[in-house]
């Protein structure tokens, strides 16, 4: 890797910047172990990002920290914020998306459904349009998304359901082929697994299409 994937490391946990295209089960732990000069089996995954999605993640380094961070995930004390670039301009420019999602395990895809049944779970997020642009002749929006639930492909499905698939996400209807799925984990907030001090970590997306078409502070 040209730059460090480690953003912060302590005895009980580490925070990394997951590269786009790296899967969480085997490839990312190997990268982290190589950089940390530790064994792969000393790293504990407490949440995941899809292969096509990059950004901030936290990994536990002890069983006790893994249990504590997993508890925070389950109790929604671990807060996740994403940047996304979607086709079209969502209206209103600030709002909430609430859906019932069904995960099709065969197709490895989520679908919004009208009524609850076995396997259906509620999905909730807040979004805010930050900027708009014309990308390859079509309108697109840079959106900040705060997750309140962590459903399978939640952001991808909820935006696509409203006619705004994420750029590069062919699985959910995007026709843009010049990029991978435009979704980035930009901010992670949680409590230190030992001291319980609140922590926040952030990372900007790479300066490649479509992220490089927007102004960043």
Descriptions of predicted regions:
Residues 1-124, 131-137, 142, 182, ...:
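RNA pseudouridine synthases
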Residues 18, 28-32, 137-190, 209-210:
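Pseudouridine synthase
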Residues 51, 159-161, 194:
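A generic beta-sheet turn/junction motif
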Residues 83, 98, 126, 142-144, ...:
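Beta-strand secondary-structure signal
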Residues 135-136, 194-196:
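Short acidic, Gly/Pro-enriched loop/turn segments at secondary-structure junctions
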Residues 150, 196-199, 204:
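A late-sequence structural motif
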